[in-house]
Amino acid sequence: GVPTDVKCRGSPQCIQPCKDAGMRFGKCMNGKCHCTPK
């Protein structure tokens, strides 16, 4: 995935930030959202 600066505690928190970044969905890894490119 693509690392972002969005802090998270769970993967559901990453869905919207990744959409906003033009990507599909994300996982929370090491406290940061990692998004999946389209």
Curated annotation (Swiss-Prot):
PROSITE patterns in alphabetical order: SCORP_SHORT_TOXIN
GO CC annotation terms, alphabetical: extracellular region
Chaperone is among the record's keywords: no
Organism (species): Odontobuthus doriae
Main subcellular location: secreted
InterPro entries assigned: Scorpion_toxin-like_sf (IPR036574), Scorpion_toxinS_K_inh (IPR001947)
Disulfide bonds: 8-28, 14-33, 18-35
More about this protein: Negative results: has no activity on Kv1.1/KCNA1, Kv1.2/KCNA2, Kv1.4/KCNA4, Kv1.5/ KCNA5, Kv1.6/KCNA6, Shaker/Sh and human Kv11.1/KCNH2.
Domain of life: Eukaryota
Tissue expression per record: Expressed by the venom gland.
Record GO terms (molecular function): ion channel inhibitor activity; potassium channel regulator activity; toxin activity
Keywords, in A-Z order: Disulfide bond, Ion channel impairing toxin, Neurotoxin, Potassium channel impairing toxin, Secreted, Toxin, Voltage-gated potassium channel impairing toxin
Family that this chain belongs to: Belongs to the short scorpion toxin superfamily. Potassium channel inhibitor family. Alpha-KTx 03 subfamily.
Compartment(s) of residence: Secreted
Domain notes: Has the structural arrangement of an alpha-helix connected to antiparallel beta-sheets by disulfide bonds (CS-alpha/beta).
Name of this protein: Potassium channel toxin alpha-KTx 3.11
Pfam families found in the cross-reference section: Toxin_2
Primary role: Blocks the voltage-gated potassium channel Kv1.3/KCNA3 (IC(50)=7.2 nM). Correnti and colleagues have also shown that this toxin inhibits Kv1.1/KCNA1, which is different from Abdel-Mottaleb and colleagues conclusions.
